[in-house]
């Protein structure tokens, strides 16, 4: 088990144990320590790798584990102990899932297959990152606002709700120079064809208000931003924050995706892979990464324990 003692719900808590089950626990403090710990676990032989933390911990374990496991990963499971735990929602795990629950589900063979997003910088020589939710534009601002919500004590669904309310207010009542309305320089293209993703006549062709992409099938709070037919990489792209779109937003998030949305500037897209060029930072599973050019592919097929 990779145990992140800094995760929100692990602070001040004692580590769980399961009678009759041998669990090797590592608590790396840096990413280099994490890579060494994963290598040691792999050398010893491992059947189940438990990730005790939030979405950011999962991202780091998957990213640093690429060089260790390649395409032959052990079965994975998540104990949701972070400020955000979107992957656990998709896997069907309850927020209070315990170590004994995970072990029981693993022994019963309750598993699902998932592929993470593989994000590779085109302009820097560094390993690809693996994560499940990537966003840019106003999504980055939303995550920053969410960190403010965390600092005043809002977490999970409450933090999402508070952040969404603040962002919508900025869009509806802010001026065009407001950073929540001005958008981000963002070139998006399908790969490997290089075909540009569609852009409506609203806003500047080189700018987008928000981009969100994921391989998850279920989102937190029951949000149905993506359509059922979208796969394998599901994208939602908003060209410009028009009031007509935001008036329909509650219905859109509940799964109503009428045909006029694309002409109005909200696109629901599917891709095998895509590229993005940004002039502002983006977010991968809760963490900022620098502006630049990136290739987004599907990572290796992973097996996760499910509830």
Task: Briefly describe each language-model feature range.
Residues 1-52, 56-68, 96-104:
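ATP/NTP phosphate-donor binding region
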Residues 2-3, 8-12, 70-207:
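Catalytic core of DAGKc-family lipid kinases
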Residues 10-11, 141-142, 220-222, 284-285:
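Short helix/loop capping segments that flank catalytic or ligand/cofactor-binding pockets
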Residues 198-205, 221-307:
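ATP/nucleoside-binding phosphotransfer catalytic cores, i.e., glycine-rich phosphate-binding loops
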